[in-house]
Amino acid sequence: MVRLVYILFLKHPTNTCQPSHVLPLSPIYGGTLLTSDRQLLNIFCLFEETKKTSVASLLTRSVSGAENALDALLNLNPVAVFRTCLVFPPWRKLDDLGHHLDIAHPLDAHLYDPIFVSLLMAHVLGVQRPSSAVEWVRLFRTNAVSLLVRSLSSRNILLRNTCVSQISEIMNALQVSFRGLFG
């Protein structure tokens, strides 16, 4: 079913990339490496390109029912994120989301899409970063930062650069937070 919707969005992006058409898709997006989830992520990216509007608020609610991006990130399954670090998909690219949809792995339903986690982390760091030491600890417990570190070995330079930037931002935010606590 998702494949059919995906084809329709690709053929008629001007007509289909409307908030009223994209919003119903967000609850079925799980952020995994399943082909259907990758197709949905491509639809969301197509929406952003067509409408020049962020779809981040839709994705925040879709994965965990969270009210904001930080809660969505903190509600990621740490075991699944760690599993994604171990079985990292080397073919996944940040700048080429529409390709490799034919690639499938038996664990895809149990792995997060590193692109999704990276984009969610970027949104959190840009909009609503953790504000307390407890939230930072919870963030590290999700293994999302570990996935950023693992993504540094990606073949895709854009993904590597994005992750370096995010890790740098995390380090700066931690230095500022702890300087306020101890300085």
Predicted regions: what they are:
Residues 15-16, 50-54, 80, 92, ...:
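Alpha-solenoid repeat scaffolds
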Residues 1-9, 18, 32, 36, ...:
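HEAT-repeat alpha-solenoid elements in large eukaryotic scaffold proteins
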Residues 70-102, 112, 116-128, 177-183:
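Long alpha-helical HEAT/HEAT-like repeat alpha-solenoid scaffolds in very large eukaryotic proteins
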Residues 13, 19, 24-27, 78, ...:
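Proline-rich intrinsically disordered, low-complexity coils
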Residues 23-30, 99-107, 145-153, 183:
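HEAT/HEAT-like alpha-solenoid repeats
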Residues 140-183:
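Helix-rich alpha-solenoid scaffolding regions
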Residues 14-23, 97-98, 136-146, 179-183:
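Core helices of alpha-solenoid repeat scaffolds
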